[in-house]
UniProtKB/Swiss-Prot annotation:
One Gene Ontology term, aspect cellular component: proton-transporting ATP synthase complex
Residue pairs linked by disulfide bridges in the UniProt entry: none
Name of the molecule in the record: ATP synthase subunit delta
Record flagged with keyword Membrane: yes
Gene responsible for this protein: atpH
One Gene Ontology MF term: proton-transporting ATP synthase activity, rotational mechanism
Free-text function comment from the UniProt entry: F(1)F(0) ATP synthase produces ATP from ADP in the presence of a proton or sodium gradient. F-type ATPases consist of two structural domains, F(1) containing the extramembraneous catalytic core and F(0) containing the membrane proton channel, linked together by a central stalk and a peripheral stalk. During catalysis, ATP synthesis in the catalytic domain of F(1) is coupled via a rotary mechanism of the central stalk subunits to proton translocation. This protein is part of the stalk that links CF(0) to CF(1). It either transmits conformational changes from CF(0) to CF(1) or is implicated in proton conduction.
NCBIfam families: ATP_synt_delta (TIGR01145), PRK05758.2-4 (NF004403)
Membership in a protein family: Belongs to the ATPase delta chain family.
Lipid bilayer topology: Peripheral membrane protein
Keywords: ATP synthesis, Cell membrane, CF(1), Hydrogen ion transport, Ion transport, Membrane, Transport
Amino acid sequence: MYEFLDRRYALALYEVGEKNQKLEEYINDFGEIVHLLKNDENINQVVNHPQISTSEKKKIFMEIFKGKIDEKLLNFLLLLLEKKRIHDAEGILTQLNKISLEKHNKVVAEVRTVIPLTDNEKTTLASKLSAKYNKIIIFKEIIDKTIIGGVYVRVGDDVIDGTIKFKLESMKKVMLKEE
């Protein structure tokens, strides 16, 4: 929702993690915390309860997480509680992962096919995408029977749609225009 703010918080956490040489630990621990925030009924009740003060929420978080996560990450969580941004934790995690990929010159390519790509096809596609974007490619493979055949690739906002479904829809539009 507030992508710009999420990114600012994520960048701050990234820099602290990098400075303390605990970046991967922070990303993993924060990911687990976000999972808890989304799925643990008790934590949700505490976070969302209007009659529990922020200071009480902070005490509860201290009891839960102290000694289990790095102190600086705990301080970050407490800051999110204080600034009433704890509900934005998932967006912050998303931005944190994006920043990490950017800093390591990596990009995620969402690849949709009807059947899994062979290792040779993955290698070929990775080298072509890597040359185009000048980044290391990380595949996120999705099997999608609705595309009929071919390959759909999304890298950031760029889409390469080489699916049969897309080609059929394009032909249909052309044929309907001519009538």
